[in-house]
Structures are given as structure tokens and as C-alpha cells.
């Protein structure tokens, strides 16, 4: 069976809403990781994140790496919300894997959460689990800024 590595940065992560879609596709968890410092992250209506590559203006984003059977990759992509796609993601060690990325239009008028460092940290800050000053820089943003 052929497989590929897939970096996920939102609701596909372990224990979150869409993780059963990864499991149903036959995926197995490999490790927690981070991107290179060239991505920005937005909260899309507080339902899921969108990560965009922004060379020279980004930060590291926490994510998980999963091994996914090629036959299940389309199933995972089809279960993602509109505006998210599979593309190449640069990891902090310089390696490149497939990953879930957002399209710029999706981020217009949405809250930028890059300073949180990842979706889990944003969700925790929003719930007050990390104190009132967590992710202070959260603000509406533009994908082309």
C-alpha cells in the first residue's frame, strides 16, 4: 500500500472534530511538528483554521504529521471545508510534505491567529485556558497583507 505524509493544522488533528475523517481513511499519527517560519494562520468563523504560506512575513505553526494511504487522500480532501486544499508544506527541519492549506479569499475579514502559534493554542486561549492575555495579537486580517 502506497502512503504519503500529510501535515494537518486544524480540526483534522487528534481529538478534534474532523479527526475521524483521517482515521476512516486509514491514516496513522506520526508526530507533532511545526512549519518553517513562513506561514500565517487565520480562524475561519471560529470553526476551523486556514494556513497560508507568506514568505518573509510568517511564523512557525504547530501541526501534526500523519501517514495517509494514497487511496484515502481524496477522501480526506473531500471532507474538508470549502476553501481548503492540499499543497506542499515546509516543515521546520526543511523537509516538504503534503499539507492542508487555505486559499487567500477564505481569510478576508477573518481573525488572524498567527501569534497563537497554532489552532489548539487559539482554541485554548479562546476558552480562557491560558489566561486573559493569551494570543493578544489576534485581529481581523487580510491574506495579502
Regions found by a protein language model. Name each.
Residues 1-145:
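Glycine-aromatic micro-motifs
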Amino acid at each position: 500500500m502506497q502512503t504519503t505524509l500529510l501535515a494537518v493544522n486544524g480540526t483534522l488533528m487528534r481529538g478534534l472534530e474532523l479527526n475521524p475523517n483521517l482515521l476512516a481513511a486509514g491514516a496513522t499519527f506520526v508526530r507533532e511538528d511545526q512549519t518553517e517560519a513562513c506561514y500565517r494562520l487565520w480562524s475561519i468563523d471560529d470553526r476551523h483554521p486556514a494556513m497560508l504560506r507568506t514568505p518573509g512575513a510568517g511564523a512557525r505553526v504547530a501541526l501534526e504529521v500523519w501517514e495517509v494511504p494514497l487511496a484515502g487522500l481524496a477522501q480526506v480532501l473531500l471532507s474538508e471545508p470549502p476553501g481548503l486544499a492540499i499543497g506542499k508544506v515546509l516543515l521546520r527541519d526543511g523537509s516538504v510534505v503534503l499539507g492542508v492549506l487555505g486559499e487567500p479569499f477564505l481569510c478576508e475579514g477573518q481573525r488572524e491567529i498567527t501569534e497563537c502559534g497554532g489552532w489548539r493554542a487559539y482554541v485554548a486561549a479562546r476558552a480562557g485556558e491560558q489566561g486573559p492575555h493569551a494570543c493578544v495579537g489576534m485581529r481581523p486580517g487580510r491574506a495579502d497583507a
